[in-house]
Amino acid sequence: MAPPRRRLAALVGLVAVVVIGGGLLAVTRPWVPKTCAATAATAHPEWSVARRWNEALLDAIRRALPAPTVHTRNLFHTSAAMWDAWAVYDPKASGYFVHDKLTASDVASARNEAISYAAYRVLTARYIKSVGADESLSEFDDVMDSLCYPIDVTTADGSTPAAVGNRIAKAVLDYGLADGSNQAGGYADPDYKPVNPPLVVNKPGTTMIDPNRWQPLQLEHMISQNGIPIVNGVQQAIGPQWGHVKSFAIPDGGTDGVPIDPGPPPRLGDAATDQAYKDQAVEVIRDSSQLDPTSGVEIDISPGVRGANTLGTNDGHGHPTNPVTGQPYAPDLVNSGDFGRALTEFWADGPKSETPPGHWNVIANTVSDELSPNLRIGGAGPAVDRLEWDVKLYLALNGANHDAAIAAWGLKGHYDSVRPISMIRYMGGLGQSSDPALPSYDREGLPLVPDLVELITKETTAPGQRHAALAGHEGEIAVRAWSGNPKDPKTETGGVHWILAIDWVPYQVPTFVTPSFPGYASGHSTFSRASAEVLTGFTGSEYFPGGIDEWTTKAGALKVEKGPTKDVTLQWATYYDAADLAGLSRLYGGIHIPADDFTGRTIGSACGKAAWERAQQYFSGQARS
């Protein structure tokens, strides 16, 4: 990282901001290093130059506001720019934005330089106005300095590697101004207005005009998942127009902005899906009820008993043996309440808040490190060098994630579907829908489920009875669920208790609660399955290296509340297993229903397969833009 003086100079002394055709942004420091001693290999000598830029981009994502759509687009456009800079010097490969073909006496050096200028220009332009721009731009400058590439070389004319990289960046940035994202308008959709008034989280219940449509939340103190304060306490929808963004491999979204349409989610009041709507809200309550670390329930979460699901289901029973070792997977016994909480927090936005697509870049980089140096694209053929592996992997992976964002947000924008907090509070406020003969009947109320969703009565609120703490609320609906955020999350837990349905909240920090966009389909599920498909195709195996991957959440490391009580090691055998758990985590976290998750997995699979097939056409020179 640049010293503070240099970071300040990088912002205060911006002496040249040049826009060429709406695209090429050149930012130069007011100082020039007297000497250049390459330091690229000091920390990670095994990293390719493409990996260095990918890591710098992930750092920028961690600092910025967590908008998955925008960051995924940046990941893809940067990956495509690096691919083009590599492909220029390959006689066969097809470029994505630029189709130049050049030769060089030192192809490896030319590629490194062209890739760096392309990535630097794109990233500087995309993150100059973001939160954390000071640090991010300084890091981008530092990468260039460490590689001995002067950042004041801005020409896009000619055949030098720097000019090639600048020319590619210009093409990328010009393209981005007309790709349907409304970059010039801050990626906003000026035509979108929520149907429902805001749900005030710290007040009971909710008022909804349409219980099937998205409802923004109003929070007293709103902070993004990576800790950035947000001034307006009412959520603004992120990316309703994203289904109209130009894709990598999936079809155009058409006038509706829906590239892949599996049909609508369950709807309250719809003859065919009313019961599914209610049942899936109950499923979220059930998952919430399992977040109790004092329950004493211990479960096995090893790949030997979990995973191997059919696409779009949780019907798997695990893998009989590890195909690498030939041995059964060892049991992995954990506290049930610890599992749900650790799973939710791990998959929230990645361990360092790089958003789901960024998290899958982290996973992919780790896989690459473990496979190196035996890097065979598709799991067969000759081993390739790390740069070729990385630029091809990033093109396929982030092309898939870009399309996953378009597909998922196309459905979010088109169906504008409700989130669980609104569903549960709305139905719970109306009453129960199970028995017209019982009090508080409403056909749009919550179904009664023994020991989970119950009608509060004088008998159940009597001293010592299960609803005693809810005395005075007879006739209302109680749910057994996570009771909310404790005052001190480092030393206390909210616990699982009987609470009023109108007070239900998801297992999230109180300054976030639920993402700022509709539920259907789950972005986590779509991104994760798309990434799993690419990693399976690219590595030639659905299994992680060694047949297993894992993450340990240390005792006491949770952020929402105290816990876990002991170390929890999450495990998965295949990329698909990991992706399914990412989707499932959103139910434990209370921000998606099963329809959001399963549909996301299905359309994510389509995105990933299409991207892998399309990427191979670019590799072989058979792509047609």
Language-model region placement:
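Secretory targeting and sorting signals
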Residues: 2-29
